[in-house]
């Protein structure tokens, strides 16, 4: 649906932070369509700018970032960055290249993340199903990747649920 949007403003842009693009917890992670293959069909090739980084893979605040966009958007971004950035952290970029070597190296590293994280996700899902399943008071989904489980509770209950979770030592992210 996004590629088919018809925004009023010619310079309307969607900046998509695809922060969890390689954070699969299972071998059958979600497969997203390549939006950049679809955008031209609707004459919207300049509408989306996708960003991602290794910040949640290697070093928070010191990862290597990437921008995926149309040629027009890349040209505009380069022009702006040329003025804003004196120099990139080339040593940090080199460290990442030497560590990962290529995309397969990133995927192999992320399998290590999944080995650590999946049991924790499974534990949370099991507790949700055991304590709340079938009661009609909350819903959630079992994610195949990322770092979050979305929990939806009954209207008017979110604040109290957050307080109770905090007392139990569980951190919730407000949305």
What is each model feature region?
Residues 39-118:
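Conserved core segment of the aminotransferase class I/II
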Residues 19-22, 55-58, 71-74, 101, ...:
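Short, solvent-exposed loop/turn segments at secondary-structure junctions
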Residues 15-18, 52, 66-68, 141-142, ...:
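Short beta-strand segments
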Residues 6-7, 132, 165:
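A generic structural signal for well-ordered alpha-helical segments
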Residues 111-125, 137-152, 166:
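Conserved glycine-rich beta-strand-loop-beta hairpin in the small C-terminal domain of fold type I
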Residues 74, 78, 148-175:
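Conserved C-terminal alpha-helix-loop-beta "cap" of PLP-dependent enzymes
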Residues 1-60:
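Active-site pre-lysine segment of PLP-dependent enzymes
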Residues 30-35, 67-68, 166-167:
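Glycine-rich, phosphate-binding/catalytic loops in enzymes
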